[in-house]
């Protein structure tokens, strides 16, 4: 395994570990999800460039578009929750609290 792949896998693992550990605030969860998506984008782009697989050149761009949509939906959810409850705690998102 080359150093680039190992660094990208390490970035993904650290982001996932951050997502599992820092679940109290919605903003930290969104940042960890964004780090995971960016490491997947980097891994996909490097893999496609090293294998010269020209048919899949659009795949990292599609993944980046999905990451941007995820970030937009997450930030709108963050604004809605902070306006409604006054804080961005994830425990406020429980649907059973009516």
From Swiss-Prot:
Q: Which Gene3D superfamilies match?
A: 1.10.287.3510
Please give the biological process terms from Gene Ontology that the record holds. Answer: ATP synthesis coupled electron transport
Q: Give the record's GO CC terms.
A: mitochondrial inner membrane; respiratory chain complex I
Reactions performed catalytically: a ubiquinone + NADH + 5 H(+)(in) = a ubiquinol + NAD(+) + 4 H(+)(out)
Q: Which UniProt keywords apply?
A: Electron transport, Membrane, Mitochondrion, Mitochondrion inner membrane, NAD, Respiratory chain, Translocase, Transmembrane, Transmembrane helix, Transport, Ubiquinone
GO-annotated molecular function? NADH dehydrogenase (ubiquinone) activity
Give TM segment ranges: 1-21, 30-50, 61-81
- The yes or no answer to whether the keyword NAD is present is yes
Q: Name one Pfam family in it.
A: Oxidored_q2
EC number(s) given by UniProt: 7.1.1.2
| Localisation | Mitochondrion inner membrane
Name the membrane topology term: Multi-pass membrane protein
Q: Does the keyword Mitochondrion apply?
A: yes
Disulfide-linked positions: none
Which family is this sequence assigned to?
Belongs to the complex I subunit 4L family.
Fill in the subunit field for this protein. Core subunit of respiratory chain NADH dehydrogenase (Complex I) which is composed of 45 different subunits.
Its biological purpose is as follows: Core subunit of the mitochondrial membrane respiratory chain NADH dehydrogenase (Complex I) which catalyzes electron transfer from NADH through the respiratory chain, using ubiquinone as an electron acceptor. Part of the enzyme membrane arm which is embedded in the lipid bilayer and involved in proton translocation.
Q: What is this protein called?
A: NADH-ubiquinone oxidoreductase chain 4L
Q: What is the organism field in this record?
A: Crocidura russula
> What high-level taxonomic lineage is stated for the organism?
Eukaryota, Metazoa, Chordata, Craniata, Vertebrata
């Amino acid at each position: 395994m080359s150093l680039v792949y190992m660094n990208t896998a390490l970035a993904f693992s650290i982001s996932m570990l951050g997502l599992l550990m820092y679940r109290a605030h919605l903003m930290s969860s969104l940042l960890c999800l964004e780090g995971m998506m960016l490491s997947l984008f980097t891994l996909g782009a490097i893999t496609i460039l090293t294998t010269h697989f020209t048919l899949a050149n659009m795949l990292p761009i599609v993944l980046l578009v999905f990451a941007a949509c995820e970030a937009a939906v997450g930030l709108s959810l963050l604004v809605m929750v902070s306006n409604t409850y006054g804080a961005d705690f994830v425990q406020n998102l429980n649907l059973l609290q009516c």
